[in-house]
């Protein structure tokens, strides 16, 4: 997909206005779908959102960033808190927040249980069961599930 052409097309179809600045992918974006830079007018987009969430969600994120873009160059309120932004975003059916991405590097939790009081503990890291005990009754801990590494 040619990103610049796609953003120009969305801008014309959904806003009736031309997009004349630069667009690029930014792999460093983690928790956001895109960014608008008022200083030079360019847009950055997160390629992981397009790859993992699909074209429909990505189009709504493009609309969101184009709301910032067009409102800024019209001299209206372009920030999330501004009424102009909220109204335009609603009118073009853009996303307010990007859905959370499936995290590929998250490790499965290890589950421990106290042998005395049956208290359960979830941990990301392994616990040395010879050294550590239950926080409630001081009973021995037992590893219930061992995820495949």
From Swiss-Prot:
Tell me where on the tree of life, at the top rank, the source sits.
Bacteria
Please state which protein family the record places this protein in: Belongs to the SprT family.
Compartment(s) where it occurs, according to its Swiss-Prot or TrEMBL record: Cytoplasm
Q: Which GO terms describe its cellular component?
A: cytoplasm
**Single GO molecular-function term?**
zinc ion binding
Species this chain originates from: Streptococcus pneumoniae (strain ATCC BAA-255 / R6)
Give me the segments passing through the membrane. Answer: none
Its required cofactor(s), as named, are: Zn(2+)
Manner of cofactor binding, per the entry note: Binds 1 zinc ion.
Record keyword Metal-binding present = yes
The primary location reported for this protein is: cytoplasm
Q: What are its GO biological-process terms?
A: response to stress
Per the record, the coiled-coil ranges are none
Query: Which residues take part in binding Zn(2+)?
Result: 64, 68
Keywords, alphabetical: Cytoplasm, Metal-binding, Zinc
- Catalytic residue list: 65
Q: Which InterPro entries match?
A: SprT-like_domain, SprT_Zn_ribbon, Uncharacterised_SprT-like
Ranges for domain SprT-like: 5-143
Return the protein name: Protein SprT-like
